[in-house]
Amino acid sequence: EAVKAQERYLNRFMLHKNAFTGIMMKDDPNLIAIEISNEPHHRGTGVEVTSFVSRLVGAVKKSGFKNPVLYNITHSVQLMDDYFKAGINGGTFQWYPTGLGYHKELQGNFLPNVDQYEIPFDPVIRKNKGAKIVYEFDAADINRNYIYPAMARSFRAAGIQIATHFSYDPMFLAFANTEYNTHYMNLAYTPGKALSLMICKEIFHSVPLYKNYGNYPENSNFDHFSVSYENDLATLNLPEKYFYTN
């Protein structure tokens, strides 16, 4: 009965009509994909997990949704093949290379922490032609400007197609981030970090998937981008476009 309830919820969620736009979720052009489960820890057998995930995928697709249906595959990784047997179109990932909730600013050079984004089970994903999307990432508790572009570089080297940052702070609480005080991101209060995140967008638009620039410190300069711990600096330098975080 619990699985039936989840199927019903997902199907009706996709058929929900936005009261402001009049568009159903399944038809919303801004909905590029849907993740049907976040960070699951499955205790069942592979066959049971495939059956469960398949039912949820089916409930979404039954609505008429045409875009990819994704599943968080970074937990219970021993079930990787079973996830794809269920008909998912790809996996979702996260990255917190400096941990979470240190309660004060971390000190030191963390570029070695983001040298590579390793996906040990990547052959399974590529065999199934699965999409790879990072739904949340941050170098938490680091109030510096240099690190985000290095993360974006490593994401692209790992074949990540889309990445979304966690999280942008609303202006009224950005001075202290009382919502979740391990992340700090706001254009007014952390302008250098905000510019650094803008550079990440440029990296995702220009760096090819799976392009590898080697290891730190040689990969601190790549294409038109550079990062420097010593200068707390990230840059994009093109004739028509120049971003400088400091």
Positions of PLM-derived features:
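Glycoside hydrolase catalytic-domain groove-lining segments
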Residues: 69-70, 80-141
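Active-site beta-loop-alpha junctions enriched in small/polar residues
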Residues: 36-39, 74-76, 96, 137-138, ...
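Substrate-binding cleft of secreted/luminal carbohydrate-active enzymes
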Residues: 141-223, 230-233
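Short, solvent-exposed loop/turn and secondary-structure capping segments
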Residues: 45-48, 101-106, 145
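Active-site mouth of glycoside hydrolases
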Residues: 1-88
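Well-ordered, non-membrane alpha-helical segments in soluble/globular domains
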Residues: 50-55, 109-119, 145-150
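Extended non-globular C-terminal regions
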Residues: 234-246
